[in-house]
Amino acid sequence: MASQLDLIGGDYIAGISINPPTNSRVTSVYSEVQASRIDHTLPLPSVFKTPFKIIDGPPSSSAGHPEEIEKLFPNLFGQPSALLVPNQSNEVSSDQKLKIGVVLSGGQAPGGHNVICGIFDYLQEYARGSSLFGFRGGPAGIMKGKYIELTSEFVYPYRNQGGFDMICSGRDKIETPEQFKQAEETVTKMDLDGLVVIGGDDSNTNACLLAEHFRAKNMKTLVIGCPKTIDGDLKSKEVPTSFGFDTACKIYSEMIGNVMIDARSTGKYYHFVRLMGRAASHITLECALQTHPNITIIGEEVFEKKLTLKNVTDNIVDVIYKRAENGYNYGVILVPEGLIDFIPEVQQLISELNEVLAEGNVDEEGQWKKNLKKETLEIFEFLPQTIQEQLMLERDPHGNVQVAKIETEKMLIQMVETELEKKKTEGTYEREFMGKSHFFGYEGRCGLPTNFDATYCYALGYGAGSLLQSGKTGLISSVGNLAAPVEEWTVGGTALTSLMDVERRHGKFKPVIKKAMVELEGAPFKKFASQREEWALKNRYISPGPIQFKGPGSDARNHTLMLELGAQA
């Protein structure tokens, strides 16, 4: 057992603990649903019900530029993925006592606690006497040596619960030589056999860099990743989905369904709902499939069709006009958080504004506008006044326009209002237009995980534990065959380098795990596209209601996953 000094990772004065670890969750105040979830027994893939062994697949490559990835990961590139299969006897010794660290990295996603519980329970079952340590506050906890030993009593209140508050997360990256040295010193001092990094694409890229660094130094610490992000953009053939996506989409869809019924009840509002997903539009697409809104904007389609901001606005106005002819003066419109990043003309505007702002020649009379290209100025003038002001005033520490702070849904409402007013003046539109804006984001990150996410995460944790015990490093825990019953799920590990490509930054190649964007030829988008015209003019609203843990719908997987796996028409 680690000493109190070890448990707090060095926060002490003269041997006296400043902040001894306490369990911040008090189960006595849990709701009935929370309490019932703690003791909910999770099924496991059948491979964990018998002795198993791990078999290697063929050598792997990368998602792009294999020659550059090989240079960046000389010790890991080409290593095979791994698969757990039943065996006559376990090939790993249950007498092996391991010291494993786990870290949560990046934004929250429902199910993270169950990954940790899965690792913990795996060690209890297959490597008795092992220790699991949680690094506090994300990767910074590794660099600063802040950790706590996780015990059965400590993890118990977090089983099947939302949030990341068991050990908390952070957005720090281990990327400079000094930071790698700090991580090296921490895992060496703790004598860790393995480290599990639970995170998204950036975090798992970092996990692979750590694995390469430790291997190059002949250190015994192995590194395994786990796929986390509600955005759903960390996936591949071997990693079918990232955890948290299922829960977040169902939380958002419940709220969208409620808004739809409100729209129909009042008969006078258009609800513009912005949804999380700064890069890919997976959440927006999935919520559309679950609820059938009147209009859904998919960023990848906007980019593919080279639509302008005016095109997007005109499309919305056209649907509103046609619905008014049918007697409907209300509706629901879904907008992805990252829409602006998909419109090249807006990116050009932001680029030129950054140059103007950097020169500091912004005068109240507007003479600075002469520095913009003609077509860029037209875009700027097309924007509502409030958005123009936001672009000029909201800057990050580097002086650049803060695109993420632009409330796209409010911008679209104002632009639609302007266009409809023009139609009124022309005498072609008579109805009143009232837009209501919503942003559904943080509400979806820490909800109680669905049965699917809870079970999937638990299996990911078991998978990570088995990979570490078998001596694997530089893999991401992978659970497949997800359309089948849980007992038939497959468990293994996918080479992180196989998911990677490179980007040129500051004259050097940097490894990145490629984000999985919405594929316009993929089954989820095709199903949506085949039905959206009907949804636009008729009310085919679905109100999914709250997430269910028992009874009808409780074990349903999301449409995106089932369509991509070919398990849904």
UniProtKB/Swiss-Prot annotation:
What GO molecular function annotations does the UniProt record carry, in alphabetical order? Answer: 6-phosphofructokinase activity; ATP binding; diphosphate-fructose-6-phosphate 1-phosphotransferase activity; metal ion binding
Q: Which residues are substrate-binding?
A: 229-231, 268-269, 276-278, 337, 442-445
Query: Which key words are in the record?
Result: Allosteric enzyme, Cytoplasm, Glycolysis, Kinase, Magnesium, Metal-binding, Transferase
Where on this chain does diphosphate bind?
A: 107
Q: Which residues bind Mg(2+)?
A: 201
Which enzyme class, named as a word? transferase
Q: Where is this site: Important for catalytic activity and substrate specificity?
A: 202
PANTHER family assigned to the protein according to its UniProt record, in alphabetical order? PYROPHOSPHATE--FRUCTOSE 6-PHOSPHATE 1-PHOSPHOTRANSFERASE (PTHR43650), PYROPHOSPHATE--FRUCTOSE 6-PHOSPHATE 1-PHOSPHOTRANSFERASE SUBUNIT BETA 2 (PTHR43650:SF1)
Give the function comment from the record. Answer: Catalytic subunit of pyrophosphate--fructose 6-phosphate 1-phosphotransferase. Catalyzes the phosphorylation of D-fructose 6-phosphate, the first committing step of glycolysis. Uses inorganic phosphate (PPi) as phosphoryl donor instead of ATP like common ATP-dependent phosphofructokinases (ATP-PFKs), which renders the reaction reversible, and can thus function both in glycolysis and gluconeogenesis.
Q: What is this protein called?
A: Pyrophosphate--fructose 6-phosphate 1-phosphotransferase subunit beta 2
Q: What is the organism field in this record?
A: Arabidopsis thaliana
**Gene (name only):** PFP-BETA2
